[in-house]
């Protein structure tokens, strides 16, 4: 058991400290402290020794050197059960320090400010704090280290009851090393980001557990959601069952798609694939257009809405089973409608804007693949008309909408659209012609005609069979990357059928 007789306290986050320090004082614990922490303690009538009085050495270099002293680290690292350590500490008059309460300069908070200057960031890099934390954590069998104000009450209760066992101290040791590792990762990441280097030679990733999820991809799998240090989610859950792993993935997909499309866009997601996308003058009309694409697949889906959900739209949504809705805003009337279906998960995210600097991380066996997210867009000027038949301005708008949709569909991907709504989606097939046929059949199965439709393909057509199938289905115009060794054959097929075809020069594979 660790007997706490002496504590060193030096914190940036002072929440809960006064009550905890008073408790230590009342239990006969001698307190050593520094700077602003010392002032807070003394202002509240808590006895404490200044660090320079304790070490006999003044703070120097504008406070950059306070606790980097053998009397401090000897007291933290000394193994009192080791006779040689004990003898040397007695010889050098180094008392044992049994408890360290330290949290670090607010580097993350500082660099999160939009106009932070390099000098300010540097001055908020803590040196002495991490050193004390690591020393105490290394010697956890004899020294307790606390880095989180939320733990003060637990330690008070333990000191008052069963005491501090080695097992308990070990749990705080693990937390302490995670704390300093996260701190160093934040500093490293920020400086790399300032340099413009996206893929550093050494990658440090730190994530904080945000919440435990209902379960993983399947009910027998456990799962949790973690947030990266520099990104705070503004997802606001308003109602509904606990989120599962799959729910989070589908909500994320719904957000990504809606955020990159025009105002009043609605998309419906099932297993990470959109089964309907549309935009209109208002979200209700867009929802009705998106749902008609594939009402069967929309059953149990997640809906993303770039706009406001009112009572009328909420009523329309609740006529069928859905897992959840993510939108910019829910009116009070909408919330009242949804409250009658309390299992529907509602998430509000007012800033429906994509973080364009995000990276795409994929774990693989023995490694991690990292790439830029596929956010690059094209304009009408990037289109190359390759057929004899030329597109009208309306055709260009329809093709651009189809192209904006196909990038979100699993490869091989084909999407049939009108100017502002999907008609049929062929997703995830191993051959492109199968996706062509699947998309047309999906539309026909729900009574939608693809005659005169705009068709987007996420990658080039390797053979003319896909073009022949599109012509047979009644498509009017095709947008695709181009780049196949058989492009001339494919263009010839389009000309034979009187189709419009444009090349983008950009592929949108999605695995």
Curated annotation (Swiss-Prot):
Q: Tell me, which GO biological process terms does this entry list?
A: 'de novo' IMP biosynthetic process
InterPro entries from the UniProt entry: AICAR_Tfase_dup_dom_sf, Cytidine_deaminase-like, MGS-like_dom, MGS-like_dom_sf, PurH-like
Q: What does UniProt say about this protein's domains?
A: The IMP cyclohydrolase activity resides in the N-terminal region.
SUPFAM superfamilies in the cross-refs: Cytidine deaminase-like, Methylglyoxal synthase-like
Q: According to its UniProt record, which protein family does this protein belong to?
A: Belongs to the PurH family.
State the disulfide connectivity. none
Family matches, as Pfam families: AICARFT_IMPCHas, MGS
Q: Which reaction does it catalyse?
A: (6R)-10-formyltetrahydrofolate + 5-amino-1-(5-phospho-beta-D-ribosyl)imidazole-4-carboxamide = 5-formamido-1-(5-phospho-D-ribosyl)imidazole-4-carboxamide + (6S)-5,6,7,8-tetrahydrofolate; IMP + H2O = 5-formamido-1-(5-phospho-D-ribosyl)imidazole-4-carboxamide
CC terms in the record's Gene Ontology section:
cytosol
Name it.
Answer: Bifunctional purine biosynthesis protein PurH
Quote the HAMAP family the UniProt record gives: PurH (MF_00139)
Which SMART domains does the UniProt record give?
Answer: AICARFT_IMPCHas, MGS
Gene3D superfamilies reported for this sequence: 3.40.140.20, Methylglyoxal synthase-like domain
**Pathway connected to this protein:** Purine metabolism; IMP biosynthesis via de novo pathway; 5-formamido-1-(5-phospho-D-ribosyl)imidazole-4-carboxamide from 5-amino-1-(5-phospho-D-ribosyl)imidazole-4-carboxamide (10-formyl THF route): step 1/1; Purine metabolism; IMP biosynthesis via de novo pathway; IMP from 5-formamido-1-(5-phospho-D-ribosyl)imidazole-4-carboxamide: step 1/1
Q: What is its EC number?
A: 2.1.2.3, 3.5.4.10
MGS-like domain segment(s): 1-147
- Domain of life where this protein originates: Bacteria
Offer an example of a GO molecular function term for this protein: IMP cyclohydrolase activity
- Transferase keyword on record: yes
Q: Which UniProt keywords apply?
A: Hydrolase, Multifunctional enzyme, Purine biosynthesis, Transferase
């Amino acid at each position: 058991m660790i007997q706490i007789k002496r504590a060193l306290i030096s914190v940036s986050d002072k929440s809960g400290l006064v009550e905890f320090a008073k408790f230590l004082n009342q239990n006969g614990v001698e307190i050593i402290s520094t700077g602003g922490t010392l002032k807070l303690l003394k202002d509240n009538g808590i006895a404490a020794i200044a660090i320079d009085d304790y070490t006999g050495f003044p703070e120097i270099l504008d406070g950059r050197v306070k606790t980097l002293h053998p009397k401090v680290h000897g007291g933290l690292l000394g193994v009192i059960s080791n006779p040689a350590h004990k003898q040397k500490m007695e010889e050098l008059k180094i008392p044992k320090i049994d408890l360290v309460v330290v949290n670090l300069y607010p580097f993350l908070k500082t660099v999160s400010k939009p106009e932070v200057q390099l000098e300010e960031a540097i001055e908020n890099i803590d040196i002495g704090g991490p050193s004390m934390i690591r020393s105490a954590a290394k010697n956890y069998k004899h020294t307790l280290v606390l880095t989180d104000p939320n733990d003060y009450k637990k330690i008070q209760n333990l000191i008052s009851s069963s005491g501090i066992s080695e097992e308990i101290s070990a749990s705080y040791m693990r937390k302490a090393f995670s704390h300093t590792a996260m701190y160093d990762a934040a500093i490293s990441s920020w400086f790399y980001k300032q340099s413009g280097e996206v893929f550093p030679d050494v990658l440090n990733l730190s994530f904080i557990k945000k919440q435990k999820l209902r379960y993983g991809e399947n009910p027998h799998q456990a799962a949790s959601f973690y947030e990266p240090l520099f990104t705070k989610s503004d997802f606001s859950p308003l109602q509904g069952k606990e989120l599962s792993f799959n729910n989070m993935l589908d909500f994320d997909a719904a957000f990504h798609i809606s955020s990159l499309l025009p105002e009043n866009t609605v998309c419906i997601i099932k297993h990470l694939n959109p089964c309907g996308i549309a935009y209109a003058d208002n979200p209700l009309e867009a929802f009705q257009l998106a749902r008609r694409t594939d009402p069967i697949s929309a059953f149990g889906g997640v809906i993303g809405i770039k706009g406001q959900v009112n009572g009328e739209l909420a009523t329309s949504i609740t006529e069928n089973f859905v897992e959840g809705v993510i939108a910019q805003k829910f009116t009070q009337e909408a919330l009242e409608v949804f409250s009658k279906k309390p299992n529907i998960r509602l998430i509000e995210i007012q800033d429906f804007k994509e973080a364009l600097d995000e990276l795409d991380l994929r774990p693989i066996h023995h490694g991690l693949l990292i790439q830029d997210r596929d956010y690059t867009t094209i304009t009408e000027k990037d289109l190359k008309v390759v057929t004899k038949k030329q597109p009208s301005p309306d055709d260009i708008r329809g093709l651009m909408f189809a192209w904006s949709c196909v990038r979100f569909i699993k490869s091989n991907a084909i999407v049939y659209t009108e100017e502002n709504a999907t008609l049929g989606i062929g997703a995830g097939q191993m051959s492109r012609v199968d996706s062509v046929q699947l998309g047309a059949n999906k539309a026909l199965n729900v009574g939608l005609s693809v005659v005169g439709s705009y068709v987007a393909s996420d990658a080039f057509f390797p053979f003319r069979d896909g073009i022949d199938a599109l012509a047979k289905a009644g498509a009017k115009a095709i947008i695709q990357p181009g780049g196949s060794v058989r492009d001339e054959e494919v263009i010839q097929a389009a000309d034979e059928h009187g189709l419009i075809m444009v090349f983008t020069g950009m592929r949108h594979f999605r695995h």
